[in-house]
Amino acid sequence: MRRAIPAVMALAWLAACAKEAPPPAEEVNTGHADSVAMAAEMFDTTAFDTVTWRTPDEALSRGGLVFRVSCNKCHGVMGNGDGDLVADGKSAKPGSFLADSWKYADDPMGLRKAIFTGSAQDMPYWGLVGLKYRDLDAVASYISDYLRPTFMEQAGTP
């Protein structure tokens, strides 16, 4: 009996260390959609009333940093939706910020909300996983006030 105890303990230890199978894709997608819905409920437009910048350049500088760290990998340098994760097939292609029909072109609060809540497709719900309202404001300003106009001008689109 005493000899069996170490063997049973070893088996129990090995079983505890075994990796669990990842959840089915449907569960992951449902979980992501639930988090997007939760983020939509938590989004607070009045939080932006307290965000101030010393200069517009300060907001653009911060927004550029946030974009490079959080957005560039999917949206790409110019916002065309051709970032490294898309090129590698690890993310769905997001819409282009440069498209004439871009739905947030004249909707800064809508853009902030989209960044905060993410999307059921692939976009992270940044408001729940790391970006504060100040960073959301900065990156939205960077996209709408710098990135989109700059690259549309380079493309010859007014």
Region spans (language model):
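Sec-dependent bacterial lipoprotein signal peptides
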Residues: 1-15
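Bacterial signal peptide processing site
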Residues: 17-20
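Electrostatic cytochrome c docking/interface patches
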Residues: 27-66, 156-158
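Short glycine/proline- and charge-enriched loop/turn segments
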Residues: 44-48, 88-96
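Solvent-exposed, polar/charged alpha-helical surfaces in well-ordered, non-transmembrane soluble domains
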Residues: 61-69, 95, 109, 113, ...
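Periplasmic/extracellular electron-transfer cofactor-ligation site
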Residues: 64, 68-91, 117-125, 146-152
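Electron-transfer interface patches adjacent to heme c in soluble/periplasmic c-type cytochromes
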Residues: 92-110, 125-137
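Axial heme c-ligation environment in periplasmic c-type cytochrome domains
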Residues: 114-146
